[in-house]
Amino acid sequence: MSALCGGGTVWKLTSQATPVLRTKAAPLLEIVHKQADPLQQFPESFPLQVAVLWTNPGSDPENPLPLVHSLKEMGIPFFITRDLGQALRHHLVILYPSVDSHTFTPLQADQLTTFVRQGGFIFAQNVFWGGLQNLFGFRSFAPLRTRHHLAFSATKDAVTKYLNRAEERETQLGSDQFPEVIWSNGYVPDAGAEVLAHFDDGSAALLTNSVGKGKVYLLGLSLLDVVLRNQNNHDYEAQRHYVNAFEPGADIWLLVLRAWYEAYGRDWVRLATIPGGQRSALLLSHDVDWENSFAPGLDFARIEKANQAGSTFFVQTKYVDDANSKAFFFAPNLDILRQLKAGGSTVGSHSIIHSRGFNKFELGSGRETYPSYQPRGLGFDTASGATVFGEVRVSKELLDGEIPAQDTIFFRAGHLRVPVSLPEALERSGYQFDSSFTADDVLSNFPFALPRNLGFEEDSEIYEFPVTIEDEEPPGFAKRVPQALQVILANAENGAVSVVLIHSNESTLKAAAEQDLLRQLPSDIVKTDMLTFAKFWRARDRLQWSLTPSSLPSEVVLQVESNESVTGLTFEFQRPLATVTGGAIMSPDNRHLVLPELAPGRSISIRINYLD
């Protein structure tokens, strides 16, 4: 038997089980490291930026990546500096990652106090130095790894504006099954300070202190532990659910920072998370991982089109028989995939053998290709001849070869099992997006850049879109639509997205349930496929923008540049807008501005006049 590969090469095979398939070569790319110096990567460019004072000196300081994730996901403008004077020229300052006796001189401590007294605002984490006790409002602190829970106080404060649900008012730092979890610093507050959140031992987790015209906030946790550690799934099982529930354990700290920025920023502006001035987005997807899962996909596509929606089909390209299932990546299933693509659906990869042991696979050489790559599932979670590169790269080559105009850049692992080498394999194989975690498991409902090696030092080029709702948990998706809708609405309150995974193994009960869900969605929640939104998010995350005053009163100039094509970018303003130029559209509330479509490399300048 022979198989036609990209470029017309014909392979001679001895295995009669391998079908004849076309491939399109996926070049093996080299890892390109981003600018290593955060000071150069995030420079000062306009007055509204939050100043991040990177307090760690030395040759190996703690990376500000967790804070970068938090601020970029919320669309908050910022720059990073080690210059205290430069930071204090801005109205809002974040001290990151900590402050000890070596961080500031007594003179600099006085400068910080004067800054706050005169109307400045500081957000800091892990302040240990006695020289700043009076400013931050604490008497002492105790570092421990035995605190497992955190609860916000009943006292209302501006930074807790978005924490209105029970799941947001209390969170878990780690499962009780672990005697020790992340480090936390419990503070004993001064009489004048206010405790906004406390740990399970009663010590203060988040406190605030007013000094003169300004205010400081102090967090006894590290964003590395409560944001990035969750996102790369190295937490101590801090999630309260695995899937199908509202779990904002990492999001609450992003929302606290957003509320802090909006409460104290002067004429603040924020890059919104959802396109077109909408409130949220429902991202629909289907896993096609069984021989009878192809035809029902057409029914889902028809229903979605009738409801002005779309979806992404993650396809298992199984061309080998093994202990787990038969091969099915051949006609007539390939014809169905082509119909789905031609009808407007988007297609991603769902690996080749869909192994429960994928998280234990070796990375591989990167030279794996069809048909010489012959993986086999041997049992529940064991396999032979399988690598991460093979599952990722070869499946892309097959999808790109068999579906006209297909460029596979989205991946979802079988059984959502994630090896630490997945970001590298995806990046080097030409992917841009992944959806292999659940939102509950990583305690994150906003998309985020996936760190290389699932570590703490550097982001890969891959963006993660974790699964919020799936269909297989008992009693099944058809009986869980009301619950799913409540989770979607909870995310919508925060401007987060919800990813829905429905296996296309049958289209009677599940398709009817999907239609029921779509018909109940509020009109300000976008219904779209995953790939379309993912491209928007990538362009948003990489956007360069600034807002500066013009020579005219009540007029500012918004300068925006995108390296990628993007539609629907939206900015949110504190002050109501009166007029805008440049083809931008104001929302009815006069506080959101939707930009026209941006071409790659295009820079636009929009003049904005405020209403008041």
List where the protein language model places each region.
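Surface beta-strand/loop "capping" patches
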Residues: 532-573
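Metal-dependent polysaccharide deacetylase catalytic core of the NodB/CE4 family, i.e.
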Residues: 131, 136, 281, 294, ...
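Helical hinge/lid and interdomain linker segments adjacent to catalytic or ligand-binding clefts
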Residues: 53-135
